[in-house]
């Protein structure tokens, strides 16, 4: 099976190299960027969630913390992907070949790549330091020094995570269209990444329970569902806050971004799919689930979590593609391949970190 997936990855790499040097280079690099920001965000946010649980000292979270840490296994791959992105800068970012004088202090290649790679190195290093600290033996109740040390690392991790992921939103995504800007976009990107991470955590937790690798009572799974519900609302709140301010401001350089995506096909259809699959369906189901006793069956929660993951992945497509290749059709084949290949690499069963 490993040989098979190795061959699949090899074929995918060859196809990517051919496509990156063809007339469809803009689509190929757009697909690459979508997968990069989606999966790298998930990989870094798992340890961040564990950091939140460490700082708050949630009593139900020790097993969940170890499961959340498994996403860190993808971080080395993510860093390599960040390095490869440099090769596509002239295709993705117009300001590389046509500098914008008013934004040149921030949007210039040396500074752009320095902060992108430096932030990634710092974030990934802190993630691994936190993973290493948490995977040690359990802290004795009287060992306040070790608990304080872990809390300090967790606070540093959360700070670095918020700054870095917000910068990914501003730099890697928003600068694809350097004339458009939104002060909320970095926060929106961080919140949507956090939403996907809670969706993934729900799936991993239920799967670990089913395989006997963790023992989580229904009430603990219900707590995860509450967090997933809260993040879905916060995600939509950030989107609506951003949308309504730009729409009522009616400044062409700002409204153009939404007009191209919400009122032009095929992006208009995709926008409705993201709204319904990523928010309306999860909101309706989770609202019903959270108003009663914790159910014993968790399959519907897994389905809703998958909906959330797929919706945010499509939202990344919705944001990236019109900026790079607005006339392109949706390349579902390559997108599906990239999604499945990265999902396989991010599978906790393939990571070194054990959840048992």
Set out the residue ranges of the language-model regions.
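A cytosolic-side transmembrane-helix exit/cap motif
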Residues: 53-55, 204, 319-328
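Long, contiguous internal "core" modules enriched in hydrophobic/ aromatic residues
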Residues: 1-22, 106-274, 285-291
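N-terminal ordered "arm"
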Residues: 5-16, 20-22, 27-47
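Hydrophobic alpha-helical membrane-insertion segments
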Residues: 72-87, 230-239, 303-315
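Transmembrane-helix bundle segments that line or gate the permeation/cavity pathway
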Residues: 29, 36-139, 157
């Amino acid at each position: 099976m490993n040989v098979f997936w190795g061959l699949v990855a090899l074929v995918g790499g060859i196809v990517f190299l051919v496509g990156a040097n063809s007339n469809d280079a803009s689509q190929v690099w757009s697909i690459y960027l979508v997968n990069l920001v989606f999966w790298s965000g998930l990989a870094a946010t798992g340890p961040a969630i564990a950091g939140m649980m460490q700082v708050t000292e949630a009593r139900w979270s020790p097993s969940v913390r170890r499961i959340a840490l498994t996403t860190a296994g993808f971080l080395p791959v993510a860093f390599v992907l960040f390095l490869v992105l440099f090769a596509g800068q002239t295709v993705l970012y117009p300001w590389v070949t046509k500098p914008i004088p008013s934004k040149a202090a921030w949007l210039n290649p040396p500074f752009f790549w320095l902060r992108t790679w430096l932030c990634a190195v710092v974030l990934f290093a802190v993630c691994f330091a936190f993973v290493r600290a948490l995977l040690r033996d359990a802290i004795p109740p009287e060992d306040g020094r070790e608990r304080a040390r872990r809390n300090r690392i967790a606070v540093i991790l959360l700070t670095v995570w918020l700054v870095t992921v917000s910068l990914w939103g501003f730099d890697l995504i928003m600068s694809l269209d350097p004339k458009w800007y939104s002060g909320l976009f970095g926060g929106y990107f961080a919140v949507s990444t956090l939403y996907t991470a809670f969706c993934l955590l729900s799936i991993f937790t239920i799967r670990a329970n089913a395989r006997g690798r963790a023992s989580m009572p229904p009430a603990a799974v219900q707590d995860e569902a509450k967090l997933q519900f809260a993040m879905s609302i916060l995600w939509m709140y950030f989107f609506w806050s951003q949308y309504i301010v730009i729409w009522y401001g009616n400044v062409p350089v700002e409204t153009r971004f939404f007009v191209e995506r919400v009122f032009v096909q095929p992006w208009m259809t995709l926008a409705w799919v993201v709204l319904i699959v990523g928010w309306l369906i999860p909101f309706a189901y989770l609202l019903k689930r959270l108003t009663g006793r914790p159910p014993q069956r968790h399959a519907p929660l897994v389905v809703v979590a998958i909906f959330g993951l797929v919706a945010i992945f499509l939202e990344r497509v919705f944001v990236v593609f019109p900026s790079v290749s607005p006339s392109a059709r949706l390349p579902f084949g390559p997108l599906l391949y990239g999604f499945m290949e990265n999902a396989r690499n991010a599978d906790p069963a393939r990571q070194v970190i054990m959840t048992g």
